[in-house]
A protein has these predicted regions:
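Hydrophobic packing and interface segments
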Residues: 2-750
């Protein structure tokens, strides 16, 4: 059987060939710029011996965690690569060129491994650069606010450029090689990146919030000592957690959103290319992404304080608006001069408008300057209960506004492509997602800015830097909390748009004429899909609670039993808490992932493709609502606490402050563990559904499909999937699987 590869270059115009080469060159340029910034950051001084010692401990803890995580998931990745190969084999019958099934399977499995490796690289390098940048920001703050701001932002830009460069490079190379067969391979690429992001988000979220909750409850509430006080045994684990959760986790999360939106746009674009004969449906999204890389590089140099002490948020917004302007200008030029259709321009511009709207909404509900956070701060005067109630109200309200904004963007796509087939409307939704994540470089720079400044502030506290440096770092840290909240909102919105576009690809690929909720199988599957985000959130939040319990006991024990720790004459055993966090995160890692991978397979084989579509709709709807609620409620509680720590209602140590700390402690696992992890959950379930669907159908004459139905084999698949899910959930709820082991060691130590 003949093999047909690189067919795209044969049918492309001269401009399109040069454009594809140009996209690859710009992707590589983004990677080279990341290398240039890395050298620039590493040349900056690290400060005193004590600062270097603390930074070294943070790096050691972070690298130990990620190394152990990669070892934990290695076998599962290998097994899934085999599974992905066979899904490609089954899908190979739909090859546009009649390529052999083994080639499609090999391409999809190779794409899966490439996506997984790229996602892991983005997370690993991004985290390591954050851990290199934190001590340098702390040192720079001793002399210059402007310099500290610049180092912190450019440290995050390194991760942004890696995300842009690797995501664009991977998608473009797959398209160039496979062309019309690219959708079959791109699904593997997207699945690999999304799966690693899920692991990073779940594991990193459990680690960071278990450490944070343990450190805050014993340190701030019980002992009344400041955050990052070196006497607290959980303080190093807390600082490590900022990196593994907010750097490695968010970097992998945004990377997989970047991957999945481009995968969805190219899959739908290829369908339109086949029907219209125009390559612009595929080339345009790639050109837009390339323009985003260029805009992010240029805008980096506008993020600097125009005067010493200027609000850092103004400088960051300046860079964001410049990148947005350059991006929209490029959309106009590509839509007008290349595609000759301004609907491309309008659809991608809606994505930029959505990103800006999400920025504003998140800022409104989580900023210390806005009414919602001020109301929560006021409620702390009457205790923890009213603090919790007030935060819940803010979170619920923000969810409504976010879903309205996302719905408006989909409505805008429908209006832009009105009068056309539904595939054009969904392609417009995919372009909206492409436009929203055009500013990926800026988004990740903003996100990494938060943990870098938080770590720098912690290093300054522990090493006893002068008040001027502490004030500078406290100001940068406050801005970093807002930027982290903003990027969480963007990640959630991008997850929904990507999921909707993938849903459309599923709808088109398997020729579903309707998805009828009156059908009992579809409705039941819709209900089950809606319950999955709640079960997933329960697993992750309970994991944080279990780990935090043992961290709290360990910190209390060291205060009570290790002579000199409370007096500050002896360092606590930081490594013990780091070890507890690492062990907890790894032991709780696989159950949420198995739930995401196996639940759509079970539903699809049991009830069929239409019911699977209903299941996906339930996951997308409830997952988005729950993610926004948790992210914004948690962010609002966090910043309400910070306003009180700045002196409001009695300041640190007051009853209002203790109530605020309780609110923040409840909100932490919501905004940094369960909420963010729902983004990759939504996309993993969508991608598994599209990938595994090829095994749920049999191709018939004329190019159609019929479902396999219930056979002994399919019933066996369903039973095995359900047994693994139930068994893993049951094991995860048994405390002896993690807790008793640690407790026994603690008792022996006594």
């Amino acid at each position: 059987m003949p093999i047909t590869l690189f067919e795209g270059f044969r049918v492309a115009t001269a401009f399109e060939k040069y454009a594809l080469i140009g996209v690859v060159v710009i992707a590589i340029l983004g990677l080279l710029y990341a290398a240039f910034l890395t050298r620039q950051i590493l040349r900056e001084p690290e400060g005193t011996d004590k600062m270097r010692h603390i930074a070294s401990a943070i790096r050691s803890g972070g690298n130990a965690y990620l190394s152990r995580q990669f070892r934990t998931i290695l076998l599962l990745i290998f097994l899934l690569a085999i599974f992905v190969f066979f899904t490609g084999w089954f899908a190979g019958g739909t090859s546009a060129y009649g390529n052999p099934k083994w080639l499609i399977g090999l391409g999809r499995a190779g794409g899966f491994l490439m996506g997984a490796i790229f996602s892991a690289l983005v997370g690993y390098i991004g985290m390591n650069m954050a851990m290199q940048g934190n001590v340098r920001v702390a040192q720079a703050a001793r002399s210059s606010f402007t310099k500290a701001l610049q180092i912190a932002y450019r440290t995050g830009t390194i991760t942004g450029m890696l995300t842009d460069g690797l995501g664009l490079l991977g998608g473009t190379i797959i398209f160039i090689i496979f062309f019309r067969d690219a959708p079959l391979v791109l699904l593997g690429f997207g699945f690999g990146g999304t799966l690693i992001a899920l692991f990073m988000r779940v594991g990193g979220g459990i680690y960071t919030k278990a450490a944070d909750v343990g450190a805050d409850l014993v340190g701030k509430v019980e002992k009344g000592i400041p955050e990052d006080d070196p006497r607290n045994a959980a303080v190093i684990a807390d600082l490590v957690g900022d990196n593994v959760g907010d750097c490695a986790g968010m970097a992998a999360d945004i990377f997989e959103s970047y991957e999945v939106t481009i995968v969805a746009a190219m899959i739908l674009g290829l369908i339109l290319t086949v029907s219209t004969g125009q390559l612009s449906w595929i080339i345009f999204p790639l050109l837009v992404r390339a323009a985003g890389v260029f805009a992010s590089i240029v805008s980096t140099y506008s993020v600097r304080a125009l005067r010493e002490g200027e609000n850092a948020m103004k400088a960051i917004h300046r860079g964001y608006w410049l990148a947005a302007f350059l991006s929209v200008l490029s959309f106009l030029l590509f839509g007008w001069l290349y595609a000759h259709d301004l609907r491309f321009f309008w659809a991608t511009s809606v994505g930029v408008a959505l990103a800006i709207a999400i920025n504003y909404l998140t800022d409104y509900y989580t900023s210390t300057e806005r009414t919602p956070v001020k109301e929560i701060a006021k409620s702390t005067k009457t205790g923890p209960a009213t603090t919790i109630l007030s935060g819940l109200g803010v979170g619920y309200e923000s969810t409504v506004m976010a879903i309205i904004v996302i719905a408006l963007s989909i409505i805008a796509s429908a209006l832009i492509w009105r009068g056309t087939d539904i595939i054009y409307i969904f392609y417009g939704v995919a372009l909206c997602g492409i436009g929203q994540l055009t500013l990926t470089g800026n988004n990740i720079s903003m996100d990494a800015f938060g943990p870098v400044c938080d770590n720098a502030n912690g290093i300054a506290e522990m090493s006893g830097l002068e008040p001027k440096a502490r004030k500078t770092l406290a100001d940068l840290d406050a801005v970093g909390n807002t930027t982290k909240a903003i990027t969480k909102g963007i990640a959630i919105a991008s997850a929904v748009l990507a999921a909707v576009a993938l849903f459309a690809a599923f709808y088109e690929d398997y020729q579903l004429e309707t998805i009828n909720l009156i059908q009992w199988k579809v409705f039941v599957s819709f209900l089950i899909g809606g319950s999955i985000p709640f079960l997933f959130s329960s697993l992750t939040i309970r994991a944080v609670g279990r780990a935090a319990y043992f961290i709290i006991n360990e910190v209390r024990w060291q205060f009570a039993n290790v002579k000199g720790v409370w007096e500050g004459t002896v360092d606590p055993d930081y490594g013990k808490v780091v070890s507890i966090c690492t062990g907890a995160a790894q032991k709780e890692l696989l159950t949420p992932a198995l739930l995401a991978i196996l639940s759509p397979i079970a539903i699809g084989f049991l009830f069929g493709l239409e019911a699977l579509a209903g299941f996906l709709a339930g996951v997308i709807l409830v997952g988005q609502l729950l993610a926004v609620f948790m992210a914004n409620a948690g962010g609002a509680w966090d910043n309400a606490k910070k306003t009180i720590e700045d002196g409001l209602y009695g300041g640190k140590g007051s009853e209002a402050h203790k109530a605020a700390v309780v609110g923040d402690t409840v909100g932490d696992p919501l905004k940094d563990t369960a909420g963010p992890a729902l983004n990759p959950l939504i996309k993993v379930i969508n991608l598994v559904s599209v990938i595994a669907a090829s095994m749920m159908v049999v191709q018939v004459a004329g190019g159609g499909f019929r479902e396999r139905g219930l056979t002994p084999v399919t019933i066996g698949v369903v039973v095995v999937c359900l047994a693994i899910i139930v068994g893993s959930v049951w094991v995860s709820k048994k405390e002896e699987s993690f807790g008793r082991e640690i407790e026994e060691k603690s008792e022996a130590k006594k």
